[in-house]
């Protein structure tokens, strides 16, 4: 089971903008994920919970609101999804995370 982010980092202007990234499942199992941010005041993430099909990808939109330039990060926690799962948030609570992917975020002036 493997999950990667493309692009692997996010650099945005501190004045605010959105950036789209793909979570790519390189394995043969469906993955459930949850995204945590080190800065919930200036970043919005959609979706926070989700599934990535085997050999598939899922778009994640990172939106930066206006604020002071600084370094932050997103951490994507992931695990194999239960076979019958349809609700990502409920499924994620029911499994133990198997790995993480860190996406460094940089807001520049």
Swiss-Prot record:
Q: Domain (MSP): give its ranges.
A: 1-109
Entry's Gene Ontology molecular function annotations: protein homodimerization activity
Q: Which Gene3D superfamilies match?
A: Immunoglobulins
Give the top-rank taxon of the lineage listed in the UniProt record for this protein: Eukaryota
In terms of PROSITE patterns, this protein maps to: MSP (PS50202)
Pfam families in the cross-refs: Motile_Sperm (PF00635)
User: Which InterPro entries would you find in this protein's record?
Assistant: Ig-like_fold, MSP_dom, PapD-like_sf, Sperm-specific_class_P
Subunit: Monomer.
Protein name (database record) = Sperm-specific class P protein 19
- Name the source organism: Caenorhabditis elegans
Q: Could you read off the lineage of the organism from its UniProt record?
A: Eukaryota, Metazoa, Ecdysozoa, Nematoda, Chromadorea
Q: Gene behind this chain?
A: ssp-19
